[in-house]
Structures are given as structure tokens and as C-alpha cells.
Amino acid sequence: DGNGPKLDAFRAQTDNDNWAYGQWFAKGLNNLHHKVLNQSAYTRKDGSVIIAYTVESQSPCGYKIRDLGISSGKYEITRSRDFGPDDFKFTTNQIWTVYTDGSIELQANIISNEPSLDLARLGYVMKTPEDLGCYTYYGRGPHNNYNDRMNGAFVELYNSTVKEQFVNFPKPQSMGNREGVRWCALTNSEGQGALFISAASPLSASALPWSAMQMVEAPHPYQLPESDGNYLHLDLKMMGLGGSSCGQ
């Protein structure tokens, strides 16, 4: 039970994201829908298959979010207005290569019609079966680290679990990020699963038992719903945390 990679630019806002998260909801980053505009496919002489897509990612509407009080951890999220073709969206050109050994390569060119918007992240998220709960990665660790808080996290091979990536903050928020990830793997107890490798620069990566919106909607950890799978984020970039409540 799960899904393949979907474009993602949203995170569960941190205590330092007060300056930015209103725009993330206003632009619908919390609810992107993905539509294939065109596609093509062909088979190489070596047997590998090339599949190309142009995908448009846009929310059906914008949202307003209101903090109901610092101590409550609750937010009120409402629809603001329906979106049209000129509202915020991403357009992605994807090239998938399926090799004869079963490995799959994804190359993506991602643009938006509002490049000045400060994004929480830019990458892909996929939901994976809950039994793929063993998380191994070669990158910075073993604790949470972001691009502005990573000097004390060293590049090594780390073995963990998805559940161990969760940090018991009073209010669930963005967590579990690892910078400088060269590769990561999700496997079951028998070592079967999937390996994800960065073919270019190192990634920002995280694996958690809940989605970003599930964490936004839970005032406290004990109010999180029962996990329905694991959520793996593979990002080109993740925004830093900042050093104060204004996020700067």
C-alpha cells in the first residue's frame, strides 16, 4: 500500500516558520494535485524503456490558516478561493528510465510560475508500506539536521527505523531531516525493500510514520492518528530552520 513519487514543496511548519507558512497555504502547497499534460515512451536497443511526462502540479484552491493559540497547538484551515490557470503551479518535465535489471532512474526539471516564493522544500514524497520500517542512510546524522544546523552532524552510514526518526516535540512539526544524503534505503525485517541513490548532488531526506498534514493537524503527539504507512521525502533542498521565531 503506497504510491510512487509525487512533487512536494510543503512541510509541517516549525516554530520558526511564522514568517512563511501563511503563503504556503495561500498557494495551496499543502494540497497539490498532479495532472499529466503529455507523455511519450520508447524502448532502447539495450531493452531499457524511456518514459517522458510533462506534469502540472496545482492545488484546486488556496487556503487560509489561523493559529488558535500557542499553547493549544491547533490551527483552523479553511478554503479561501478557487484557483484558475494563472494561479500558483509547478510544471515538471520528467524522464523515467526503466533498466533491464529493474532499477529506475528519474530526471526532473521543475519550474513554477512564481519563482520568488520561499518554498519549504522542493523534491518528491512517496508513501511506502508500513512493513518497510527499517531506515538506512549514508549522510549526515544521527540526529536532526538542516542546512543551517548541520556542522555537528557527520557523514556516516546510519542504521535506524522510521519510528525512531520521530522527535517528540510538544507540537508535531517538520522533523527527521538529514542533509548530505548520498543514498537511503527502506527495508523490511528480512532486508527486502527499495534503495534510493542520488545520481547528482547529495539530497535532503527524511522518513516518518506520518505525513506533513497529519502533523499539522495534530496539536500534540498523542493526538496523531494511527500511522497508515511511511512517508519518504527525497528533496533537492530543504529550507533551514532559522535562528529565531521570525525564521531569519
What are these regions (language model features)?
Residues 1-248:
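Beta-strand/loop-rich accessory regions of lumenal/periplasmic or secreted enzymes
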